[in-house]
Amino acid sequence: MNKRFNSEDKIILAIDGLDVSQAKLLLEECPNIKWVKVGLELFVREGPRVIEILKGLNKKIFLDLKFHDIPNTMRAACSQVSKLGVDIISIHASAGLKALKDSKKASLEGATSVSVKPPLVVGITVLTSFSLKDFQTDLDRNNSIEENVLRLAKLSFDAGLDGCVCSPWEAKMLRSIYKDNFELITPGIRLNIDNKDDQNRIMTPSEAIDNGASKLVIGRSISKAIDPNKALIEIFKSIDSD
């Protein structure tokens, strides 16, 4: 029997760069993984069948497609993906209050129509790939990333969403405002020995949890490790020891 860790519900394994066969092998190597993130690349390549396969492996699924469109389109898209029986879906908070409210309502209605549990709906704030310089230059913004994250998190909360996606840098600020029933999901997680790759606002797993993150999205630190399960267990231990 595998040893259980208190923090197993806090780690979401990102499998976006893998095909289905590779993902299944990785999950066999890492039996303590409860949560899996399916992103745009994997979902476009494999389609809804990847959700069926992961559900067959008894995994909880964060379908991270980051919908961002007019309210009607977002409402229809959220209704459809909610019928797949996933556990969390993501939408861009910058789509606006009406789009967020409509998406949340549609996810409930879509899931209920096929008798599956409605997913949590979380709002994307500012992508972790942005540095402050790039954010202000590329998007022609004069204010800080933190100010924008704060505004978009409030929009998500006011729309009745279940949480938001932010970098671990902003998690402490948001957790001081929003209580534990508001999910703070943080990508941008790296171990001390890792390259930062295309992420900028990053932290280690234990630092992110200490800052108030409720779930951590971790991909390459586990999937590209020489021993993925060993890397995963070290992450669990680092969080559980806090």
Curated annotation (Swiss-Prot):
GO terms for molecular function: orotidine-5'-phosphate decarboxylase activity. Transmembrane segments: none annotated. The active site is at residue 66. Its EC number is 4.1.1.23. InterPro entries: Aldolase_TIM (IPR013785), OMPdecase (IPR014732), OMPdecase_AS (IPR018089), OMPdecase_bac (IPR047596), OMPdeCOase_dom (IPR001754), RibuloseP-bd_barrel (IPR011060). SUPFAM superfamilies: Ribulose-phoshate binding barrel. Pathway: Pyrimidine metabolism; UMP biosynthesis via de novo pathway; UMP from orotate: step 2/2. GO terms for cellular component: cytosol. Keywords: Decarboxylase, Lyase, Pyrimidine biosynthesis. It catalyses: orotidine 5'-phosphate + H(+) = UMP + CO2. PROSITE patterns: OMPDECASE (PS00156). GO terms for biological process: 'de novo' pyrimidine nucleobase biosynthetic process; 'de novo' UMP biosynthetic process. Substrate binds at residues 16, 37, 64-73, 128, 190, 199, 219-220. Homodimer. NCBIfam families: PRK00230.1 (NF001273), pyrF (TIGR01740). Catalyzes the decarboxylation of orotidine 5'-monophosphate (OMP) to uridine 5'-monophosphate (UMP). Belongs to the OMP decarboxylase family. Type 1 subfamily. This is Orotidine 5'-phosphate decarboxylase. It comes from Prochlorococcus marinus (strain MIT 9215).
